[in-house]
Amino acid sequence: MKVTAEIDVMPKEYFKHLCDITIKDIKKSTNKEVSLKDLLDGYHYEKIVPFKKREAIISMSVGPLIEDKYFIMKYETKDTKCLYYYDFSSKDGKNYVTYSEENNYKKDTIGNKLGTLKRKFDEKALKRRIFNNIELTTTYIKNHREEK
């Protein structure tokens, strides 16, 4: 699935926000300090999340990234592989972000086939949620800009 939206912040600001929240997630998940350079070069970590009264291990990979242009994240669980990226561009004085994601199940089960079918039916609602998330992110960025 791919969605392109106009954003009213600079691509550099949106990219920095994505890196900041990723760095915070790495710190929370691993208690390790990482830098933007670590993300640009590519970084891998594991996080543990609650899942159905148990814990699930998610293998996360970010990057390599192209600063202010391209942000990519992959994650993998025992059942699923997911890839998503943000591609930033400017045209005619306007800024755009293209968000794309791919989800793949590792096993070909009836439940996974039904999940894929359901996702196709829900695609319109999912695109709407993605647009809303992009809008909320730009609002957050504008409201938290550093005073210059």
Regions found by a protein language model. Name each.
Residues M1-D41:
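Hydrophobic ligand-binding cavity/cleft-lining segments
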Residues M1-E6, I57, Y70, L83, ...:
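Intrinsic-disorder/low-complexity, polar/charged segments enriched in Ser/Thr/Lys/Arg/Asp/Glu/Gln
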Residues I7-P11, F51-K53, P64-I66, D79, ...:
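Beta-strand elements of well-folded, non-transmembrane domains
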Residues E13, H44, I48, G63-I66, ...:
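Extracytoplasmic electrostatic interaction patches
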Residues Y14-L18, K24, V62, M73, ...:
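Hydrophobic pocket/interface hotspot
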Residues K32-D79, N132, L136-E147:
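Glycine-rich portal/gate segments that line the openings of hydrophobic small-molecule binding cavities
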Residues E76-N132:
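Beta-strand/loop substructures that line and gate deep hydrophobic ligand-binding cavities in soluble
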